[in-house]
Structure formats: structure tokens, C-alpha cells
Regions:
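Beta1-alpha1 glycine-rich phosphate/pyrophosphate-binding loop at the start
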Residues: 2-74, 161-182
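Short FAD-binding loop at a beta-strand-to-alpha-helix junction that anchors the flavin cofactor
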Residues: 250-266
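Mid-to-C-terminal Rossmann-like scaffold of FAD/NAD(P)H-dependent oxidoreductases
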Residues: 2-5, 262-346
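FAD-binding core/adjacent interface of flavoenzyme oxidoreductases
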Residues: 1-7, 62-147, 205, 223-239, ...
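Glycine-rich Rossmann-fold phosphate-binding loop(s) that bind the pyrophosphate
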Residues: 10-14, 36, 128, 149-154
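Rossmann-like dinucleotide-binding cores of NAD(P)H-dependent redox enzymes
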Residues: 145, 153-210, 291-296
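Glycine/Thr-rich phosphate-binding loops of Rossmann-like dinucleotide-binding domains
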Residues: 41, 115-116, 156-157, 180, ...
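A short, polar/charged loop-to-alpha-helix boundary motif
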Residues: 345-360
């Protein structure tokens, strides 16, 4: 590799934004993106919604057309797993093939789904990659019974999509309320009520004890820790993710940077911002002002937008009804430090601007 070359390990959003920003800011050295999946960078959020519903195809998920990568001299090395990083020799070592040398390295390796310590038969899925979504989509047939283990946003989106496709859906959550760790019990229970009103069987304070298989080895039921049994033709396990940190150096290395879910909160907007920040660090450019945390989710007729960083212990001020509401998380001085907004896009945009100019980001 020529001098000043940048290798980016991870072909997700953070890796793609790093490469794009390097070129946009005038970097003319070699850029290589190495991705473990055999596909170019794509929009992961659509996997649980439009792609699963069949309203978007794989080509429409691409972050950029193939001509973009070629036209900007960004090399994509896909279907390649990096096994080792040598920060001293400045090389990355793929499972097969020759090492790649780098002047600067960006680790954007993302996150992987947390696995349950159970033996899981056929018909049990996770959803992180395009391949996962392909496999799950083939099994979402009308009239079938889907059990979603985990009441997070992705699980709720899959439940919403499957319900619209005509499946019978149950959501199993071990906590007292879904997304309680982020939004608190009060708001989480509001969402659970919304799911129930739409016909979802919601089981709270119940974990997965066992997945039962039929004679063919395929799932036919799940047994919960509260003793109940749910029929299941398909199961989605969505109990969170964990960062893929195996390649991170044990000690800080001046030429090694990290971006995206491997170091961040695991959300689309944060990953994009991280990629931009990594590129600017490499180029020695000043950091951009911090942005308010932002997450969105489309489920059961609601566009949910989380602005800022809510704390479950914060007092919550509610306004609106089941179809359009704002839950404001208040600081000690009574000001809004974060909010969950449902079908309130203009207010969400205004709050993002408001928090951008407040002291909340400094205190978060």
C-alpha cells in the first residue's frame, strides 16, 4: 500500500461514512474498506421493516451505487474476515490472502447479536445482516405464529411488520416493561399497551426457558420462565447486541481509530457521526460540535423518535394520546433533557435544534 493509505475494517455505515468523508475533505490516498459480508454497504434499519415486508429490494438498500465507490477510488474488499491487527507493523491480516498495510486504520467492526445460552432448533432467527433478513423473510407466512424474544425497537419493528403480513405475533420481554432500560417503565408500558391494542400478545416479566422442537427438529413452541407455553412456527431472538472488539489493540495506538457500534450506542445516526469524526481525526481537522443523541423506530402506526439521552430515573412529563404523544424527560431544573416523540416530526426536529444549543450535551 502506498503512503497515507487508510484501511477501514467494517463495511457498515460508520465505515462507509469514514471513506466518504475522507474523499469529501480532499484526501487523495488509497482507501480500502474490508467487509465480512459479501455485499457493499447497505441500509441496515430497513431490514426489520420495508425489506422484511417485501416493499424494498436488495438493490434499493445500497448506501451508494456501485459507480460511487469506483468513481471515488474507494476499494471494497468484501466477504473477507480480518483475523488480526498488528498496530506496530501497521498491517491487518485476513483469514485468507495477503496482509494489508495501512498508514491509518479505522476499526468499524460493528456489533453482533447477543446469543442465548440455549440449544436452538431450526426456525429460530436473529436479525443483524442482510442474510439474516433474507432467511427470516422466507418464513413469515400469513397465519403462522411468530414469537419475538426481546422487546427492543428492532423486535417491535419485526413484530409490527409480521403482524401486517398476517402472522400471529407474541413479544416476550423479561423486564417489567419493554425498552425500560432506556425509556423507563412508564413509557415502556405505554408502548406495550399500544402493541396489545394492535393485537400483539405481550408477555412481560417472562424470559425464555426452552425452545421446543418437533420430530423434524423444527421449533413448534417456546416455554417461558413463568411456566406458560406459546405456539411458535418462527422465533426471532432480539435481546440486544454486543460490540465486536476482538481486533481492538490492547493499548491505544496512534494510527488506529474506532467508529460506530464497536464503540458507540449502536444506532444509525451515531454511527454516521462517528464515521465523519474518524475521518476528520485522520486528517487533523477540528472536531464538529456534538450532536444530540437521536434514534427513530417505525412500529404499529407510530414514528417514534428519541431525541437526547433519556435516563429511566428522570421524571417524565406526558402530553398527547396513544396516536400522537410526547414524553419529556426532565432534568433537575425542570428543563427537557430528552424526549420520546410519537408521530410528532416537527416537534422532534425543533427539539433537536433546541438541545444542540443547550447545556444538556455537556451534562450528558
Amino acid at each position: 500500500m502506498n503512503a497515507h493509505g487508510v484501511v477501514i475494517v467494517g463495511a457498515g455505515l460508520a465505515g462507509a461514512r469514514t471513506a466518504e468523508t475522507l474523499r469529501a475533505e480532499g484526501f487523495d490516498g488509497r482507501i480500502v474498506i474490508v467487509g465480512e459480508e459479501p455485499v457493499a454497504p447497505y441500509e441496515r434499519p430497513a431490514l426489520s421493516k420495508e425489506f422484511l415486508a417485501g416493499t424494498r429490494d436488495e438493490e434499493s438498500l445500497q448506501l451508494r451505487k456501485p459507480s460511487f465507490w469506483d468513481g471515488h477510488a474507494i476499494e471494497l474488499v468484501l466477504g473477507t474476515r480480518i483475523e488480526r491487527v498488528d498496530p506496530v507493523a501497521r498491517t491487518v491480516h485476513p483469514a485468507h490472502g495477503q496482509p494489508l498495510e495501512f498508514d491509518q486504520l479505522v476499526l468499524a467492526t460493528g456489533a453482533r447479536p447477543r446469543r442465548l445460552p440455549l440449544e436452538l432448533p431450526a426456525g429460530v432467527h436473529e436479525l443483524r445482516t442482510l442474510a439474516d433478513a433474507r432467511n427470516l423473510r422466507t418464513e413469515l407466512t400469513p397465519g403462522s405464529h411468530l414469537v419475538v424474544v426481546g422487546g427492543g425497537f428492532v423486535g417491535a419493528e419485526v413484530a409490527s411488520t409480521a403482524h401486517a403480513l398476517g402472522l400471529h405475533v407474541a413479544i416476550v420481554e423479561a423486564a417489567p416493561a419493554p425498552v425500560a432500560r432506556v425509556l423507563g417503565d412508564e413509557v415502556g408500558l405505554m408502548l406495550a399497551d399500544r402493541w396489545r391494542a394492535r393485537g400483539i400478545d405481550v408477555r412481560l416479566r417472562a424470559g425464555l426457558a426452552h425452545v421446543r422442537a418437533d420430530a423434524s427438529g423444527r421449533v413448534d413452541a417456546v416455554l417461558l420462565t413463568d411456566g406458560s407455553v406459546l405456539r411458535a412456527d418462527v422465533v426471532l431472538v432480539g435481546v440486544g447486541v454486543e460490540p465486536v472488539r476482538e481486533l481492538m489493540p490492547e493499548r491505544p495506538a496512534i494510527a488506529v481509530h474506532a467508529a460506530g457500534d464497536v464503540v458507540g450506542p449502536g444506532h444509525w445516526t451515531a454511527a454516521a457521526q462517528d464515521g465523519v469524526a474518524a475521518a476528520r481525526r485522520i486528517l487533523g481537522l477540528p472536531s464538529l460540535p456534538p450532536q444530540p443523541h437521536y434514534v427513530w423506530s417505525d412500529q404499529f402506526g407510530l414514528r417514534l423518535q428519541v431525541v437526547g439521552s433519556p435516563r429511566p430515573s428522570d421524571p417524565v412529563e406526558l402530553d398527547g394520546d396513544a396516536d400522537s404523544f410526547v414524553a419529556r424527560y426532565l432534568g433537575s431544573d425542570g428543563s427537557t433533557r430528552a424526549a420520546l416523540l410519537a408521530n410528532r416530526p416537527l416537534e422532534a426536529a425543533a427539539l433537536r435544534r433546541e438541545l444542540q444549543t443547550s447545556d444538556v450535551l455537556l451534562a450528558a
